[in-house]
């Protein structure tokens, strides 16, 4: 191995394999852009985002780690959410859960 060398396997990497997903239509009803990161509990996003909030409980955006989705004012788009994994306990964010899902 050479320092800094990449050793990449053939094929594709499937993110979040085997986890339940949900597609929702989300609209930004506010007057400012809203950006949501890859691991933010979608249920607790900015109230200016309108969508089926109850359905999003325990889910996050199904996008690569470290990335985000930006919603411009008045913009509406479909997003895919994926279930949170691990112990399924949520703390922080907007403080709407603060415990087990």
From Swiss-Prot:
Question: Where does the sequence pass through the membrane?
Answer: none
**Which Pfam families does the record match to this protein?**
Urease_beta
Cellular component terms per the entry's GO annotation? urease complex
Q: Which domain of life is it from?
A: Bacteria
Recorded catalytic reaction(s): these are: urea + 2 H2O + H(+) = hydrogencarbonate + 2 NH4(+)
Q: Name one GO biological process term.
A: urea catabolic process
This entry's Enzyme Commission designation comes to 3.5.1.5
Q: Where in the cell is it found?
A: Cytoplasm
Q: Which InterPro entries match?
A: Urease_beta-like, Urease_betasu_sf, Urease_subunit
Pathway connected to this protein:
Nitrogen metabolism; urea degradation; CO(2) and NH(3) from urea (urease route): step 1/1
Q: Does the keyword Ligase apply?
A: no
The protein's matches in NCBIfam families, at most eight in alphabetical order, are given as: PRK13203.1, urease_beta
Q: Could you say which protein family the record assigns here?
A: Belongs to the urease beta subunit family.
List the protein's name.
Urease subunit beta
